[in-house]
């Protein structure tokens, strides 16, 4: 990474590295890894089974919970976990697209495949 890019995106790299460290060495490894690669861990399997709904649900849940967390370190850890779940969601979506399963129904109110019964947001 060039010095200019470091100056422009260094803080983003820092935030992403927090997510990597949490998943690879911290809470993620302790609770979820079971010595499996990231793409084979429970989160990724759950995303596949729920057409991405698991990742969306975890992100939504954490967004709801974070304002009630008083401890700053715990609050930050939960924020970082959103990045991990979002990364898993991106990887699930790439798999989904490669399989040719995209049918144009990812634009509903939740952004999750399979929630066709929910009302659409008005533009």
Indicate where each model-derived feature is located.
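Intrinsically disordered, low-complexity regulatory regions
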Residues: 1-123
